[in-house]
Amino acid sequence: MSASVPLLQKLNQRFVDVIQEMTIALDEISLEISAEQLLEVCLALRDEADFKFELLVDICVVDYSDYGVSEWETNRASLTGFERGVDNSGEQRSIPWHKPRFAVVYHFLSLVHNQRLRLRVFATAEPPQVLSVITLWPAANWYEREAFDLYGVFFVGHP
C-alpha cells in the first residue's frame, strides 16, 4: 500500500464537498478545487493536525491554451523539429479540453508527515485571477509575482 493512501482518505473525508478531482501518481496526491474554496482549503491544509502542510514549495501557472494539440502551424517546411514526425492527416486537437485556460498549481510539503501535495485551481475570471495565499504562506510573494509577470494571472489581495 502506498504511503499516500491514508492521506488520500483523510483528504477525501475532510473535503468531500470541495474536491472536484483527486488523483495519485508517483506517490503524490493531486487535488483540484474551485478557486472560491482556495483560502478555506489552504488554511485547513496548513493548520489541521491530519495535514500540516506548513511549507509552500512552489506556485506555478499552467496555460492550457494548446493542450491536446499535437501539431502547430508553420509557414514553411522544415527538415528539423517536431512537426516532421507527426501525421498531419488527423484531427487538430487530440485531447478534448473543456476547462478554463489557466490553472494555478500549488505544491506543498508536510515535514511532520513527510508528504507532498499538489493543489490545482482554475482561474475562471477574465482577466484570470485567484485569491492570494500570501497571508498563509509569506513565501507566496515571489511565486505570485512571477506568475503575474509571466502569465498575467492576478492574485487578489497580493500587496
Where are these predicted regions, by residue range?
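Terminal low-complexity/charged segments
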Residues: 1-159
